[in-house]
Amino acid sequence: MLELKKRPYFTPNDPEFIGSDDAESIQKAIDTASQLGVNRVVIPRINARTQKPEWLIKRTILLPSNMTVVLDNCYMEQCQSAYCQMFTNSLAHEVEGRLPENEQHNIVITGVGNVTLSGGKPNGLLERTSGRNGLPSIWRNHIMYFHNARDIVIENIRIKDQRWWGICFLFCRYCRLSNIDISVIPHVGNQDGIDLRRGCNNFIIENITGRSGDDLIALTNISNKHETVWAVEGRDPDTHDIIIRNVKGDSNYCFMLRLLNHDGNKMYNISVDGLYDVSKPESKQRPGAAICIGSHLYYSFRAAELGETRNISINNISSRGEAAVLISNTLADSYFSNIKTFSDNADIIKTTGLRADLKNVIFDGLFSAGDQMDMLDDTPYEEPVGSILNFECATLGENVVVKNAFAKKLGVAFHLGKNMKVDAKNINIETLGIMLEKGEGSSLTLDGKEV
């Protein structure tokens, strides 16, 4: 044992740790590293047990506090027969893991070189089969899952063909995710890339690339059964102080970034800088929008109220979706700048759903650069389409400001629903159908004059 303590790290290829399967070998190395205070395990490319460049995971690898796992040019895949995550913190699914005093900490998963964590072949565990016919909950089907943990670092890896969400956090804080690539051929439902669920705060998410089968990144704070049962006693349930920057990716019809909160859970102090839609112009499976804020769906007992989604700062966005930004339900005290759409039939900012109440929201620097071509048959539209603001679904707008907006062609510059008060400045559109369509109680002031 003394000789083991002298090693700078352990590997699952060390003879002392080789088990009956790859997950057992890795777990033995991690457990011993933790017990002896070595606290570092390296998973190399070649698997000594099988002499193959792969690690097949049939049970969850449990990570204790103060553990660094280095993935050295390795390929890891979930076995088709497995109904479990690849990595979790060791108390993630334990009852005592719901206690604040059992918060785990200082867990690092870092990749070196070309590292892939794959969901492998689908195992039949889907949202519609979750908990049925002897199957466990779909919440066991992530690649990584962390619950009641802090100071988590995940970096320099590729997530491939996840079976549900790639990386998921619940009641976690002070975490950093960087240099993560999501690579999905959509073949099962709801293949989000990175998900922050209830009770997450103080995250940095940066340098994210790739394509997801659903939302690329989702901040979702709702009180569904799992989020309620596994709530950490006395812990802040809100989502706040999240920094997201330099995201270049694509989503299969959904969103590059979703922000959603309901059921009294608040979302605030979210900063986004650099969200770039890299879908191909000819693609028929573009993201619905670069970013979607809110929804009139998905709540358990009540929708979010005005002021519960606030202090959202969105900068440097480009999109080929039906809108660059979709807003639903509520949004307050927020700022958007340098928002571009390159789609041929898109609105720059659009409300959606049954309701959209906005208060103290500024849109500064909006650009529409589409050529107004029908993507289905490559012919020009007979009439200009799209809007700077398509707020047809809006039900309230107090102190909404739009300034410095530019477009080649638009059908209706401002499409306002009910009770919208919009102040616009410096609007420049080369070819325009009409400036304003408005509903009851709405008005537009353009450069100081009411339209």
Task: Report residues per predicted region.
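Extracellular/periplasmic carbohydrate-active domains that bind, remodel
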Residues: M1-V451
